[in-house]
Design a protein with these regions (language model features):
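Ligand-binding pocket scaffold of soluble enzyme catalytic domains
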Residues: 2-5, 40-42, 80
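Alpha-helical scaffolding segments of alpha/beta enzyme cores, especially the outer helices
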Residues: 20-34, 64-71
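Alpha-helix N-cap and loop-to-helix initiation/capping positions
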Residues: 16-24, 56-64, 98-106
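Oxyanion-hole/transition-state-stabilizing segment in secreted/luminal serine hydrolases
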Residues: 1-24, 46-47, 153
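Substrate-gating cap/lid alpha-helix
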Residues: 49-83, 104
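A short helix->loop->beta-strand "cap" motif at the edges of active sites that frequently abuts
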Residues: 33-38, 78
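Short, solvent-exposed loop/turn segments at secondary-structure junctions
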Residues: 11-13, 48-56, 90
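Conserved catalytic region of serine esterases and O-acyltransferases that act on ester linkages
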Residues: 75, 98-99, 105-180
């Protein structure tokens, strides 16, 4: 089994080139499927509590990206782990503080969904949504948004202006495999 998840960060970039990114993804899947391994491909979450033009643009981009992943999976007989099978993951409480990636519980639950797709033992309650969240007080929400802008948005813009990638100089979160 060979799992492959790539290209989603490219979708977020201001200079995103769908033709290039989607073709590179297709070529990578073609090479990987040539290994004889069973491929496991992943779609991305399309809708995370966002409104406005940027949120709509990302939804459209991720929809197109996901259609490409589905077509690739179909063409090579890959197993597909569909993020849309877990709509509860669009709940912000499953996101890391960067608001882009899943947090530990989001990853744990999605991993259980992957085990289900693979027809392996898994936690049957992996896809149960959290109870509705209490509305945060106005100033708490604004404070959290300001912290997010200072901690993630401004550094991202600064890296982009200097031609650096967000992955430059970063190491893995876990140096050893993590067992759930």
């Amino acid at each position: 089994l060979l799992s492959f998840n790539a290209g989603a960060n490219d979708v977020l970039r201001p200079n995103y080139n769908p033709a290039k990114t989607l073709e590179e993804y297709r070529q990578a899947v073609k090479v990987l499927s040539g290994t004889g391994a069973t491929l496991l491909l992943f779609t991305a979450i399309e809708n995370v509590d966002g409104t406005g033009k940027v949120a709509e643009m990302w939804r459209e981009r991720f929809s197109e990206y996901n259609e490409n992943v589905r077509a690739c999976a179909k063409s090579c007989g890959a197993i597909l782990a569909e993020a849309k099978r877990a709509p509860f993951l669009s709940d912000k409480r499953f996101l890391h503080t960067d608001r882009l990636h899943l947090n530990a519980e989001g990853h744990r639950r999605f991993a259980q969904g992957v085990l289900e797709v693979l027809e392996l033992p898994h936690d049957e309650s992996w896809d149960i949504p959290l109870p509705p969240a209490d509305r945060k007080p106005f100033f708490q929400e604004k404070s959290e948004n300001a912290k997010w802008i200072i901690s993630f948005v401004i550094p991202w813009i600064w890296r982009r202006l200097r031609g650096r990638s967000s992955g430059d100089g970063r190491s893995a979160k876990h140096s050893e495999p993590v067992k759930w």
